[in-house]
A protein has these predicted regions:
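Helicase motor interdomain insertion/brace
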Residues: 1-223
Length: 223
């Protein structure tokens, strides 16, 4: 379970929500009108002969997988990534709406945060690269906006349901604190007071430190 609170969404429900996301925020080139595709054929920031649309599909797949990795790492990391994705989606929707009112607008086709990927994924060809711009006049903005809005709504619901999972109700964190308490109370080596915890994500490591450090200092006088 994610939390000791029975009202909190389950891992199964989160998995189903994540895998049902369109994540079309990362695939704008799929919505380019056929008549305009040639204009972007040479547009790429890739290695080898990977097309922009191919790269975008790769990023979308990586992000979907990585969201689940983030959840496995900590609910805190998962919420941070979901919030960043929603912010990007909402900004893009605002840009589309601005275009509908005022006309010409260019939009960055590519925007991912390396903080949301583990070390292995940041070395992937899909992630490394610079932004490329797309003219919204060349895009089926109606279809794209519909998918973006659906994702924004679903992510918003997920974030709302996860608000209750504070550190006090984070079951994974509380289980870790119990393990630390047991190790310190019943040490194999009484002279070894170090606590070493590994994580693939820097923000998970910081989240754990921020919650473990005051706990062991208050309870055991350790720094």
């Amino acid at each position: 379970a994610l939390s000791d609170l029975s009202s909190v969404v389950s891992y199964k429900d989160i998995y189903e929500s994540v895998t049902s996301l369109n994540l079309s925020i990362y695939t704008p080139s799929l919505f380019i009108f056929d008549s305009k595709r040639e204009k972007y054929m040479g547009t790429s920031h890739n290695k080898g002969n990977m097309t922009q649309s191919g790269r975008e599909r790769g990023v979308r797949k990586l992000m979907s997988i990585n969201l689940l990795k983030r959840l496995e790492s900590s609910v805190n990391s998962f919420v941070l990534t979901l919030s960043r994705i929603k912010e990007l989606i909402d900004h893009t929707i605002q840009t589309i709406d601005h275009f509908k009112r005022n006309g010409l607008t260019k939009l960055d086709m590519y925007d991912v945060s390396e903080n949301d990927f583990d070390i292995d994924d940041t070395n992937n060809d899909f992630v490394v690269g610079k932004k490329v711009q797309i003219d919204l006049a060349d895009v089926d903005i109606k279809s794209w906006r519909e998918e973006l809005a659906a994702d924004s709504e679903n992510i918003g619901i997920l974030l709302f349901m996860l608000k209750e999972v504070t550190p006090k109700h984070d079951k994974k964190l509380q289980t870790l604190l119990e393990m630390i308490n047991n190790k310190i109370t019943n040490p194999i080596n009484p002279n070894n007071k170090k606590i070493i915890i590994f994580s693939a994500f820097a923000d998970t490591a910081m989240y754990l430190y921020d919650n473990i450090a005051p706990y062991v200092q208050e309870k055991f006088g350790l720094h």
